[in-house]
Amino acid sequence: MSKIIGSDRVKRGMAEMQKGGVIMDVVNAEQARIAEEAGAVAVMALERVPSDIRAAGGVARMANPKIVEEVMNAVSIPVMAKARIGHITEARVLEAMGVDYIDESEVLTPADEEYHLRKDQFTVPFVCGCRNLGEAARRIGEGAAMLRTKGEPGTGNIVEAVRHMRQVNSEVSRLTVMNDDEIMTFAKDIGAPYEILKQIKDNGRLPVVNFAAGGVATPQDAALMMELGADGVFVGSGIFKSEDPEKFAKAIVQATTHYQDYELIGRLASELGTAMKGLDINQLSLEERMQERGW
């Protein structure tokens, strides 16, 4: 049974079902219900949204299981939860609880600075962040069923998510015109498994979905990421740190679905209050940048 449920094909198929949708961070049952009613395809249950994690400092860990369970009981859509990079036990606890996906997340303080989780050893599918094709291929090689840009979480600034999406897409384009010898050299240069790169070259795309995450704060941000080739959008602090979370949630879902309907997006934006306050990425030191976590 577990071999069937835990196969790459099934895990990736589950992630494909979220394609074109919005996944929202929530910290309680009420927020989860708002997200579901707004049209979210899944929710991410956590103790604090990324902007609060950033503001609080210290060590950020897996959410209290009570919070995750509360969210799971409140909605019918899939529920994700975050585990620290390399923290086998946090991931096993979440798997035992029955979450639908685990995010091995740089938003939390890494538990292991050398190794990511061997995601292929779990039954539950994983989502992981990436900034470039090397990171994407390494995570896929470890068993990730879904990818997302790292962006810079909790900033309300889309610039890093844009950079990461463009970087992955441009490297995939370069890869598709390489011969086998060039792929071998490229694999060495970017620290990626040759077999994964060969698979990407043969298919002309990543073998898993790649969502946008890290800095999405407005309907325009969500639509931009879809324009750039994202398979869907994660929204962390952007919704529940806005002036009107319910309206923002619905607007971001609609903008993601109709990302080339600019008149609609304009109308949606005009009816909203103030978005979350953003941070200038250049004012963050390397140590403050969550995207630098992992390898």
Swiss-Prot record:
InterPro entries: Aldolase_TIM, PdxS/SNZ, PdxS/SNZ_N, RibuloseP-bd_barrel
GO molecular function, one term: amine-lyase activity
Record lineage: Bacteria, Bacillati, Bacillota, Bacilli, Bacillales
Membrane-spanning segments: none
Listed PANTHER family: PYRIDOXAL 5'-PHOSPHATE SYNTHASE SUBUNIT SNZ1-RELATED (PTHR31829:SF0)
HAMAP family: PdxS
Subunit structure of this chain's protein: In the presence of PdxT, forms a dodecamer of heterodimers.
EC number assigned by the record: 4.3.3.6
Residues at the active site: K82
GO biological process, one term: pyridoxine biosynthetic process
Encoding gene, per UniProt annotation: pdxS
Protein's UniProt name: Pyridoxal 5'-phosphate synthase subunit PdxS
Domain of life according to the entry: Bacteria
Keywords, comma-separated and alphabetical: Lyase, Pyridoxal phosphate, Schiff base
Family affiliation: Belongs to the PdxS/SNZ family.
Ligand binding (D-glyceraldehyde 3-phosphate): R166
Annotated metabolic or biological route of this protein: Cofactor biosynthesis; pyridoxal 5'-phosphate biosynthesis
Role played: Catalyzes the formation of pyridoxal 5'-phosphate from ribose 5-phosphate (RBP), glyceraldehyde 3-phosphate (G3P) and ammonia. The ammonia is provided by the PdxT subunit. Can also use ribulose 5-phosphate and dihydroxyacetone phosphate as substrates, resulting from enzyme-catalyzed isomerization of RBP and G3P, respectively.
Binding site for D-ribose 5-phosphate: D25, G154, G215, G236, S237
Catalytic function, reaction form: aldehydo-D-ribose 5-phosphate + D-glyceraldehyde 3-phosphate + L-glutamine = pyridoxal 5'-phosphate + L-glutamate + phosphate + 3 H2O + H(+)
